[in-house]
Amino acid sequence: MKYAILIGDGMADYPIEKLGNRTILQAARTPAMDSIAARGRAGLAKTVPDSFPPGSDVANMSILGYDPATYYSGRAPLEAASMGVALAADDVAFRCNLITTEHGMIKDYSAGHISSDEAEILIDTLDYELSTENIRFYPGISYRHLIVAGNNLGAETECTPPHDITGEKIDKYLPRGKDGEFFSELIEASKVVLELHPVNLKRVEEGKNPANSIWVWGQGYAPKFTAFMKLYGKKGAVISAVDLLKGIGIYAGLDVIEVHGATGYLDTNYEGKVRAAIEALKTRDLVFVHVEAPDEAGHEGSIEKKLKAVEDFDSRIVAPILEYAENSDEPFTILVLPDHPTPISVKTHTRDPIPFAIYRTDKPETDNVEAFDEESVKNGSMGLVKASDLIGILIKS
C-alpha cells in the first residue's frame, strides 16, 4: 500500500456573502477532491487543540501524527531545521518576517511577497549591521526568515504573529514581557537599516511594498521528535515550499524533497511537485504534499485568489496524483484536507475543525458525501476526529 497526504493550506473558510453564502470550497470547481470524498470516507478533523495557537506548525504536526501536547516547542525551531541552522540547548529561534509598515501600522505581513533574492540581500545587511554575540540573522524564503538568540534570550517573550494584526497599530503589539523591550528595540533598529536600502528604494519605484521592518514571533527551543518510521513503520517524504513543513519532516526523520520553483504562492511549481511526489513513491511508502497558496490568499482577504489557489490545487496536484494512483499496479490510500481554516473575513487562521476525505483505490466506499467541503463532509461516516489520530486511521484503513 502507498499513501499520499495532500494538504491545501488554509483552504477551509466561512460562508461568503459574495459567493451566495457559500464557502470557497463550495464555490470552487474541485472535481478531483469531490471524487475522493464521494468514493471514500469523510469527516471533520480537529487539527488545533484548544490550548494551542491555530498555526500551521501545530496543525501540520497533528496531521503527521505528532500530538502537539507532546512535541510542540514553537514554530521557528522547525524552520531552523529546514534552513540547516543547528540550535544549541540555550538557543531560542524566532521567525523573522520582513514586513511593510506605514503610518505606524502593519500594512503587509509579507512585504508584497518579496522575492527570496531581494530578501537575502536585506537579511544579510541586517546581520551585518545588527548581529551581536547573542543575535544572528539567517535568510530563508520570500518574507520568512530566522533570528537565533543565544543564552535563552526571548524564551519567555510574548509575541504576536504579524498576519493576525495586519492594519493594526504596531505599538499595541510589540514584543512584551521578559526581554520584550530588547526585541522591540531590535524591530525599531531594523527600520533604520531597511528604510533607505537600495532594494527597498527600487521596490518603491516599481510600486511594490517595501520590506521596511522586521517582525519577530513564533520562538522556541529545538524540539525532540520520535522518528516517523518508529511510530508508524513507514518510510516517507515531505514536499513543500515552506521551511516550516520541511523542518517538521526533518525532525520526523522523513526525506525532504526540494522542488525548483516551489514558491509558497500562486506561482508555485505545481507540476514539479507532482513529479517529485510520484518519483518519491517509487522508493517510499508515503508522501506528504503541501501547497501554501490558499493560505496566503486567505491572509490577503482575496476571494478571487483563494478560489484560484483551491482550483489549482485540485486540478494540478490532486487530479494528477489521483490519476497516477488509480493507474498504479499498487493500491493507494489518499488523504486530502486543509490544515486549518484561513477565512477571507478574518484574514488569519482559526481553530475550527477542517474537512477531510480518505480514499482507497482498491476499496471504494459510499459515504453519503458527494462533494468535498465543510458542510458536505458532515454527512460522512468518520464524524469528528482528532487530527493526530489520522495517520493511524489512514494506515489501518
Curated annotation (Swiss-Prot):
Alphabetized Pfam families for the sequence: Metalloenzyme, PhosphMutase
Stored CDD domains: iPGM_like
Pathway in which this enzyme or protein is active: Carbohydrate degradation; glycolysis; pyruvate from D-glyceraldehyde 3-phosphate: step 3/5
GO molecular function: metal ion binding; phosphoglycerate mutase activity
UniProt cross-references to Gene3D superfamilies, sorted A to Z: Alkaline Phosphatase, subunit A, Metalloenzyme domain
Keyword Repressor: no
Database matches in PANTHER family: 2,3-BISPHOSPHOGLYCERATE-INDEPENDENT PHOSPHOGLYCERATE MUTASE, COFACTOR-INDEPENDENT PHOSPHOGLYCERATE MUTASE
Membership in a protein family: Belongs to the BPG-independent phosphoglycerate mutase family. A-PGAM subfamily.
Full protein name: 2,3-bisphosphoglycerate-independent phosphoglycerate mutase
